[in-house]
């Protein structure tokens, strides 16, 4: 599935049910002739189409460290297995689809935010809706941003992504009575704990401690990954953020699960290039996608 980039804001239809908003997102529906499943995968952080008004002062190669690079390539087989697939084209460093639109870092504003600010651990770290910092303490901008600048990003990028994902989920609930949403991310090979570098597992699944999806779905995905030989953690160190919190309502048949994959399995983090492990991981992800679709179809078929 080819990467698509552009700067126009006009909608372009690809094939029936598919949508391309240049520079913003691409939506893929199940391939023709494939049994559809009540499943949607989304990749909000793999975009690399940097807008012309992104007035950053750090080099592009530094900004790219914020990307979940190639995650969209890992999950591009979803439509062929019967699932919907949505990916952002804009970069996470420009505006983060996995943050609430009021999750604002007030330190980077030239004027007060017009609504109550949602203060979170991430926003206080400079990693809110609009990133202030990259690589720990490196400032992305050399000036404060205006409310108008941020609102333009929200209206042109953040809200369209949410609207498209919501429509995909709603359509499946209307058809099947339930939907299984998989929010796809990648994580650094190591994390920090008490000042020490700690190797991370192959996968981390997040369901916000059982609040965003039925624990049985989380356990199913964890078991499938372990069967393939991968190490898996659940809700540690990532339990999921805004997207699965917003859309995961398991009591209403709306199940949202976040999946983080260790970048060391498939890419060189310094060069931001795929390595020889990409193919093997892609085959595992394809198998996982098929098993998730079969799981979901089995759930809606139960009396």
In which residue ranges do the predicted regions lie?
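N-terminal catalytic or cofactor-binding beta/alpha core of small enzyme domains
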Residues: 2-181, 186-255, 261-303
């Amino acid at each position: 599935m080819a990467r698509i980039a552009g700067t126009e804001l006009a909608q372009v239809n690809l094939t029936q049910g598919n949508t391309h908003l240049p520079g913003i997102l691409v939506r893929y529906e199940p391939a023709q002739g494939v049994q559809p499943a009540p499943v949607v995968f989304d990749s909000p952080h793999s975009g690399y189409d940097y807008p012309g008004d992104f007035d950053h002062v750090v080099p592009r190669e530094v900004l790219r460290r914020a990307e979940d690079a190639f995650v969209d390539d890992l999950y591009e087989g979803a439509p062929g297995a019967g699932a919907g697939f949505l990916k952002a084209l804009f970069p996470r460093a420009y505006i983060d689809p996995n943050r609430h639109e009021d999750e604002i870092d007030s330190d980077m504003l030239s004027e007060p935010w017009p609504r109550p600010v949602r203060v979170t651990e991430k926003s206080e770290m400079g990693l809110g809706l609009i990133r202030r910092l990259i690589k720990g303490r490196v400032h992305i901008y050399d000036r404060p941003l205006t409310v108008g600048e941020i609102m333009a990003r929200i209206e042109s990028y953040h809200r369209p992504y949410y609207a498209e994902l919501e429509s995909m989920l709603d359509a499946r609930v209307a058809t099947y009575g339930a939907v299984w949403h998989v929010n796809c991310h990648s994580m650094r090979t190591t994390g920090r704990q008490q000042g020490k570098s700690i190797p991370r597992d192959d996968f981390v699944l997040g369901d916000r401690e059982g609040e965003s999806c039925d624990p049985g779905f989380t356990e199913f995905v964890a078991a499938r990954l372990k069967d393939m030989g991968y190490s898996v953690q659940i809700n540690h160190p990532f339990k999921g953020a805004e997207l699965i919190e917003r859309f995961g309502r398991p009591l209403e048949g709306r199940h949202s699960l976040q999946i983080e994959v260790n970048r060391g399995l498939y890419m060189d983090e310094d060069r931001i290039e795929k390595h020889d492990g990409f193919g093997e991981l892609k085959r595992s992800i394809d198998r996982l996608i098929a098993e998730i679709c079969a799981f979901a179809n089995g759930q809606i078929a139960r009396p």
